[in-house]
């Protein structure tokens, strides 16, 4: 399968992108040149998604929120992806040593600390810049004083080096590294309680949408990225005032919208430039 397209970049420059998926793997091209990694393609074409399951960003564990945070960090600081690749490699080596109870566990600590602290600093910088956008978005969408707090993945009273030493015996017992940015989270709280414990499914969706909207507005202002936003079944879990809040916030975004739905909800965001219909597995213009 091959998908190609043309995007408008900085200063109204145009660039062609392409992705081809075969049995042997996935390849990508940017302006006719092979992309060495899919991260290059992702950086060239920023896409975010709001779909019916977006409430899981609030409801489920830290993995989803780390991915949400890192998506924005990568676009503001492109070198972040290299840090994460290095960290993942070192973490894998340390965990392998823990599983075999090898005496080389501590050999990996210095690298883990150095790269882990760099990742944490990048995430904290992003969160500081994001918070004003978050506060405006969550107020407009939910009307609730929901708070975001970055939890770095180890005790605030310890450096990462100290945490690794303190948890060494426990790490050996569990055979995995328990401190570091891979254990980080973004706590979502309302009046000091976990938002997932007090918000309805519809409210969780609006909070998760606010997290996404805040990201997009930050990227537009900070690095002049004009993202594409994919909306799938936007009215799911929403009705009345909540749906109107959602429509108002999304309509204010200065980005391309692609809306998919079984119902004519795309009209809620204004007259679409193009409309297509899926029929018998084929996409046809209307």
Where in the sequence are the language-model features?
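Active-site donor-binding loop signature of nucleotide-sugar glycosyltransferases
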Residues: 52, 278-280
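Long, charged N-terminal accessory/stalk domains
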Residues: 56-58, 63-106, 110
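Walker B catalytic acidic pair
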Residues: 232-234
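Conserved D-loop beta-strand region of ABC ATPase nucleotide-binding domains
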Residues: 260
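Conserved short hydrophobic beta-strand within the ABC ATPase nucleotide-binding domain
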Residues: 273-276
């Amino acid at each position: 399968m091959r998908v190609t397209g043309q995007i408008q970049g900085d200063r109204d420059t145009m660039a062609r992108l392409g992705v081809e998926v075969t049995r042997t793997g996935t390849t990508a091209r940017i302006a006719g040149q092979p992309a060495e990694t899919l991260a290059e393609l992702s950086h060239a074409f920023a896409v975010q998604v709001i779909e019916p399951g977006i409430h899981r960003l609030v409801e489920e564990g830290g993995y989803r929120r780390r991915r949400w945070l890192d998506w924005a960090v990568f676009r503001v600081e492109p070198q972040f992806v290299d840090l994460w690749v290095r960290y993942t490699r070192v973490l894998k080596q340390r965990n392998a040593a823990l599983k075999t109870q090898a005496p080389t566990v501590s050999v990996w600590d210095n690298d883990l600390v150095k790269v882990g602290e760099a990742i944490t600093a990048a995430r904290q910088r992003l969160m500081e810049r994001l918070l004003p956008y978050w506060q405006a978005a969550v107020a407009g969408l939910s009307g609730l004083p929901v708070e975001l707090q970055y939890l770095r993945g180890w005790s605030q009273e310890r450096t990462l080096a100290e945490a690794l030493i303190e948890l060494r015996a426990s790490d050996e017992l569990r055979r995995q590294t328990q401190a570091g940015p891979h254990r980080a989270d973004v706590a979502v709280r309302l009046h000091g309680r976990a938002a997932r414990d007090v918000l309805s499914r519809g409210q969780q969706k609006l909070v998760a949408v606010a997290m996404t909207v805040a990201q997009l507005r930050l990227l537009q202002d900070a690095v002049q990225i004009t993202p594409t936003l994919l909306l799938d079944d936007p009215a799911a879990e929403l009705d009345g005032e909540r749906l109107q809040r959602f429509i108002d916030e999304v309509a204010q975004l200065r980005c391309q919208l692609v809306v998919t739905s079984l119902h004519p909800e795309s009209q809620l965001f204004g007259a679409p430039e193009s409309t297509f219909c899926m029929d018998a597995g084929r996409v046809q213009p209307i």
